[in-house]
A protein has these predicted regions:
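Hydrophobic alpha-helical membrane segments
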Residues: 53, 167-179
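Membrane-interface helix-loop-helix junctions at boundaries between adjacent transmembrane segments
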Residues: 44-55, 59-74, 101-106
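The feature marks the first
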Residues: 1-60
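Membrane-interface helix termini and inter-helical loops of multi-pass transporters
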Residues: 3-11, 59-67, 96-99, 123-134
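Structural signature of hydrophobic alpha-helical transmembrane segments
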Residues: 11-25, 68-82, 133-145
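Surface-exposed interaction/gating patches
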Residues: 103-167, 175
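C-terminal ends of transmembrane helices
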Residues: 28-43, 85-102, 150-162
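Alpha-helical transmembrane segments of multi-pass integral membrane proteins
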Residues: 1, 48-57, 77-90, 105-126, ...
Length: 182
C-alpha cells in the first residue's frame, strides 16, 4: 500500500489529498465488483486486497501528514475501530471466521476489518519505526516475531484458528509494509 501510494504521490505528482481521493474511488469500484461475485475469483479478491492496502495506508498518512494527527493517537484510534468492528460483526453475525463470509453483511465487516488492519498496520509500523526510533529492520523483525508467536500459540492449541488468523494478519500486514515503505 505504502509503495503504491508513494508512487502515485511522488512519481505522478498527484499529492496526498488527490491520490487519497482517487484511490478511494477506485477502491469503491473494486469492492462493488467484489461484492457482485458469486464465488471466489482470485484476481478480483487480490485486487481488492491491494486497493484496501493502498487506501488504508493513505488514510493513516493523510491523518498524520496532512492533518497533523499524532501517530500514537492514530494507532489507538485504528485499534479501537478494529476492535469495534470485530465486536459489532460478532454481535450481529455470531462469527468472525473467514470461512463463514457468505453473506453481504459478513463480507462488508470483513473488508472493513481489513481496511482498519492496514490503517492500523501503517500507524503502528510508523510509530515503532520512526517515532520510537526502532527503524524499519527492527520493527519488521519484531512484527515477524509476532507472527511466529501467533503460529506457535495456534499450533499449541492455545488460541483458535479465528483468533490466530486475525492476529497473524495484523502482524503480517505490519511486517510486509515496513520494508516496502522505507
Amino acid at each position: 500500500g505504502e509503495t503504491g501510494a508513494d508512487y502515485l504521490i511522488f512519481q505522478w505528482g498527484l499529492g496526498l489529498p488527490a491520490t487519497s481521493a482517487l484511490m478511494s474511488v477506485v477502491l469503491v469500484a473494486i469492492l462493488w465488483l467484489q461484492f457482485r461475485q458469486d464465488r471466489y475469483r482470485p484476481w478480483v479478491y487480490w485486487l481488492a486486497v491491494t486497493m484496501v492496502s493502498v487506501v488504508g495506508t493513505l488514510i493513516t498518512d493523510s491523518l498524520v501528514d496532512t492533518y497533523g494527527v499524532p501517530l500514537p493517537l492514530t494507532t489507538v484510534v485504528f485499534a479501537v475501530a478494529l476492535i469495534a468492528t470485530f465486536a459489532i460483526w460478532y454481535g450481529r453475525e455470531g462469527t468472525l471466521s473467514i470461512h463463514a463470509i457468505d453473506t453481504p453483511p459478513r463480507e462488508g465487516f470483513y473488508w472493513l476489518a481489513i481496511l482498519f488492519t492496514f490503517a492500523l498496520g501503517t500507524a503502528a509500523g510508523d510509530l515503532m519505526a520512526e517515532r520510537l526510533g526502532l527503524g524499519y529492520l527492527s520493527s519488521t523483525l519484531l512484527f515477524g516475531a509476532g507472527i511466529a508467536v501467533v503460529a506457535a500459540l495456534w499450533r499449541l492449541d492455545i488460541i483458535g484458528p479465528v483468533t490466530g488468523f486475525w492476529q497473524a494478519s495484523l502482524n503480517f500486514f505490519k511486517t510486509l509494509r515496513l520494508p516496502l515503505s522505507s
